Amino acid sequence: MEKRDELYAGKAKSVYRTDDPQRLILHFRDDTSAFDGKKKESLARKGMVNNKFNAFIMEKLQAAGIPTHFEKLIADDECVVKNLEMIPVECVVRNVAAGGLVRRLGVEEGQTLTPPTFELFLKDDAHGDPMINESLAETFGWATPEQLATMKALTFKVNDVLKQLFLDGGMLLVDYKLEFGLFDGEVMLGDEFSPDGCRLWDANTREKMDKDRFRQGLGGVIEAYEEVGRRIGISF
């Protein structure tokens, strides 16, 4: 497969076209950012760690019957994915109160959420990725009711698989965001799953093992990512 021109550069990944119009290459960079890009840093090994972490998780989800865009690793920091028509709506599940939920509602951080909450956000950096609902998504054409129903069902299926995976490694899957797209009309999981896009706490100590270490200046960001991976069986 031939890597061609850069299609898009995000905050931490670059997307490249290939000689196959239905396939793309994702390049995971060492860049990290927070607070809508106001805090930025380059962290050695991050691209490699997130690429391998994402591949491991995507393969677990595929084995559980969840369709994803992931196809294969081709380098320490690159993988091949299907070229999805992305749906501009993020799905967020929260198992434990943290982050934006605590700020919005004033609830206590660390409270177990039963049942888990499900939220939708519009992918729109210029407006701070605002929270939306199904009605808005349908009215403005961001997603159809059928697509939203499939996205919600898949998001909760991901929760069933990954909550147990991380719990077996002594960790709590606090919350996470997912993005979906269409491939030949089928809704499938896109983007990535890594500690950049979820919250993970040690189940006993509640130590933060995710991107909050960067947001809050706790240090040891990549070491924490690698420890999460080690606990669930990833070899870096």
Swiss-Prot record:
- Alphabetized InterPro entries for the sequence: SAICAR_synt/ADE2_N (IPR028923), SAICAR_synt_PurC (IPR033934), SAICAR_synth (IPR001636), SAICAR_synthetase (IPR050089), SAICAR_synthetase_CS (IPR018236)
* This protein's record includes keyword Phosphoprotein: no
Q: Got a GO cellular component term for this one?
A: cytosol
Enzyme class comes to: ligase
Known EC number(s)?
6.3.2.6
Q: Which GO terms describe its molecular function?
A: ATP binding; phosphoribosylaminoimidazolesuccinocarboxamide synthase activity
Annotated signal peptide: none
- A single GO BP: 'de novo' IMP biosynthetic process
Task: Specify one Pfam family.
Answer: SAICAR_synt
User: Which reaction(s) does the protein catalyse, per the Swiss-Prot or TrEMBL entry?
Assistant: 5-amino-1-(5-phospho-D-ribosyl)imidazole-4-carboxylate + L-aspartate + ATP = (2S)-2-[5-amino-1-(5-phospho-beta-D-ribosyl)imidazole-4-carboxamido]succinate + ADP + phosphate + 2 H(+)
Pathway, per Swiss-Prot/TrEMBL?
Purine metabolism; IMP biosynthesis via de novo pathway; 5-amino-1-(5-phospho-D-ribosyl)imidazole-4-carboxamide from 5-amino-1-(5-phospho-D-ribosyl)imidazole-4-carboxylate: step 1/2
What residue ranges are annotated as transmembrane?
none
Keyword presence, Nucleotide-binding? yes
Supply the Gene3D superfamilies for this chain: ATP-grasp fold, B domain, Phosphorylase Kinase, domain 1
Q: Which UniProt keywords apply?
A: ATP-binding, Ligase, Nucleotide-binding, Purine biosynthesis
Q: What is stated as this protein's family in its record? A: Belongs to the SAICAR synthetase family.
NCBIfam families tied to this protein: purC
Protein known as: Phosphoribosylaminoimidazole-succinocarboxamide synthase
Q: Which species does this protein come from?
A: Chromohalobacter salexigens (strain ATCC BAA-138 / DSM 3043 / CIP 106854 / NCIMB 13768 / 1H11)
Phylogenetic classification of the source organism: Bacteria, Pseudomonadati, Pseudomonadota, Gammaproteobacteria, Oceanospirillales
